[in-house]
């Protein structure tokens, strides 16, 4: 807010009536700041230190999910403060308000993980409610942990207020036995310890050193994926995703976001002016070229639905087939977001794709410049290194990529008529046949793995974990990491109607739709059924006839909801299919299953 000043007794007399500050007619905050009938409203603002100058300025909300529950968000008060200062200095009226967060890592492997995807919806709903109720003119949406990012972007799109997306930045890598590590190595260490491949002392050292400070998980996991895609979509300035959480550049990015929020109000630029079908295709191309999280499939579908843009799960596969994987970060590789930042950040990847005609640089961004213009601006004004100046063993030329196709694969077949999602972190030609080992929940599967029962060739099936059936579509990094830690990264497949963490690696296939709860074929599987996973052909099949699948489904008892009251029950009853983004906004419910 502006510097506190002594009240000017003549201020109201300068206009025709109290509260006549000559505000912009376009600003809906006029409804609460202007006119004699709004004197009580202004009195409330004055109680918080706002002055006449503030009340004549655009009211810019800064939703902030700061919390001590996760290192992803523990520093966000400082990030938000820099944004507030930027708004104030640029002539806006900054108003910070809170919203929730869930720590995916801390809730992982517990019943509490069912809250994770629900939190995406609660964040979007809460930001919409506050900005609607308080008649805000614009937003700077601050985000840290995984579901913060799509939740904030959904709110910006749904309200269509001039908005700037602001990521809190990622954590630096930890050090263990002379190598960089992240939280994912700790999860995998649990599996290695259970199999006797890691000592208790080694696991303890890994636990104590993997996470050295504030910031979101460091690899190309869900938070860093969605932050990168915010640049591709145009909702955040180019170069804003990669500065680490505890780096001074992160706070410069935050201050600039605040200044930019005032600009987008003045220039009347809205998310609907920025987002197009092509901007979503750009985001998918970047996701698959960087080996981004499978969660981004779910979130991009939800964002497109909010924007009223036709996007289908098969679009991800079509774009992945034509887009090579050129960045090799964790979990597929060894490097983290900070390594990418040191060579120029997300813009250097976008530039390579754009120069190969795999990314459309003509799309508008929040700055008012196109992607192509933004790249030129970064090169000329901010020292973005040229391609010739980049020497990095984890960033590949488009004509000599890490993999000829992108990392995201959409599989279909009689087990997943509406699709399933896989991120390839290893063999692009993976083909697997084996017997089903069927579990009705994640906990039973985890126990099976930790007790050493899995064998080479197995296909672990975890069902009743979908958006409605879970409810909440839990991530399963615990069990997938345990499989990898037990030495079965390449010879055991895992299928589920739930989700995976962005840190998952190996042949783990999620988002199977329809889910078991609504009668999907995964609900018909029995132990020993022969399953084939064929990545080159993009198929996932069980060796059963359609009539046998139908018979089994007809004979099964209709499932009962896992929860009948409370927030989990409420959102569980609202979720749509994973194949359409698992949205809960009733205006977007066209198919539901």
From Swiss-Prot:
Superkingdom classification of source: Archaea
Co-factor binding details: Binds 1 [2Fe-2S] cluster per subunit. This cluster acts as a Lewis acid cofactor.
Pathway: Amino-acid biosynthesis; L-isoleucine biosynthesis; L-isoleucine from 2-oxobutanoate: step 3/4; Amino-acid biosynthesis; L-valine biosynthesis; L-valine from pyruvate: step 3/4
Binding site for [2Fe-2S] cluster: 72, 145, 217
Positions carrying N6-carboxylysine: 147
Comp. bias regions, Acidic residues: 1-17
Keyword Mitochondrion: no
Binding of Mg(2+), residues: 104, 146-147, 475
InterPro entries associated with the record: DHAD_IlvD/Edd (IPR050165), Dihydro-acid_dehy_C (IPR042096), DihydroxyA_deHydtase (IPR004404), DiOHA_6PGluconate_deHydtase_CS (IPR020558), ILV_EDD_C (IPR056740), ILV_EDD_N (IPR000581), IlvD/EDD_N (IPR037237)
GO molecular function, one term: dihydroxy-acid dehydratase activity
SUPFAM superfamilies: IlvD/EDD N-terminal domain-like (SSF143975), LeuD/IlvD-like (SSF52016)
EC code: 4.2.1.9
Any single biological process term in GO: L-valine biosynthetic process
Subunit field text: Homodimer.
Name of this chain's protein: Dihydroxy-acid dehydratase
